[in-house]
Swiss-Prot record:
This is Beta-crystallin A1. One of its GO terms (molecular function) is structural constituent of eye lens. It holds the Pfam family Crystall. Residues 14-53, 54-100, 107-148, 149-197 form the Beta/gamma crystallin 'Greek key' domain. SMART domains: XTALbg (SM00247). Residues 1-13 are annotated as: N-terminal arm. Has a two-domain beta-structure, folded into four very similar Greek key motifs.
């Protein structure tokens, strides 16, 4: 049976259908809330999926750990559809949850040059495929405050590399250090950022 985690309850309709084979074949299950361990549902892994409503975060490991993948409305026939722009191809997707605070139209994020919200800062309300091309001098970000909505930050320009999902309703929207970006955070290198679509 699908496990409900202690995260905030979504305020709207969320729906994801997962399959144990590629191209939407084999065993399938629909979810409208979090799943901390797909193996408890009789799957050894998720091989394809369809996001019908809402934004979701998929995780490489159970219990919402490991590499993160943003899953927006659409079809993902194979693992490379959700990790294809990722420089680190990972075929595992073992847990997932809805993104409760995704609000594409009213998103606001402030990035800071150094940890603990120190140094140069820049307020963002739009998508940036290259922070450097838009005027951010560094290829690193020290800390971030999500004032509204949810964002996905990428290690490299063009929305490539590790994905870090930041939400206004987690950590109070405050990410003081790069290690708070996710259990898999390897570096504070961030070179592209975009809003998460609902």
């Amino acid at each position: 049976m699908a496990q409900i985690n202690p995260l905030p309850v979504p305020l709207g309709p969320w729906k994801i259908t997962v399959y144990d084979q590629e191209n939407f074949q084999g065993k399938r299950m629909e979810f409208t809330s979090s799943c901390a361990n797909i193996m408890e549902c009789g799957f050894d892994n998720i091989r394809s999926l369809k996001v019908e409503c809402g934004g979701w975060i998929g995780y490489e490991h159970t219990s919402f750990c490991g590499q993160q993948f943003v899953l927006e409305r659409g079809e993902y026939p194979r693992w490379d559809a959700w990790s294809g722009s990722n420089a680190y191809h990972i075929e595992r997707l073992m847990s997932f949850r809805p993104i409760c605070s995704a609000n594409h139209k009213e998103s606001k994020l402030v990035i800071f040059e150094k940890e603990n919200f120190i140094g140069r800062q820049w307020e963002m309300c739009d998508d940036y495929p290259s922070l450097q091309a838009m005027g951010w001098v560094n290829n690193e970000v020290g800390s971030m405050k999500v004032q509204c909505g949810s964002w996905v930050c990428y290690q490299y320009p063009g929305y490539r590399g590790y994905q870090y999902i930041l939400e206004s309703d987690h950590h109070g929207g405050e990410y003081k250090h790069w290690r708070e970006w996710g259990s898999h955070a390897q570096t504070f290198q961030i070179q592209s950022i975009r809003r998460i679509q609902q």
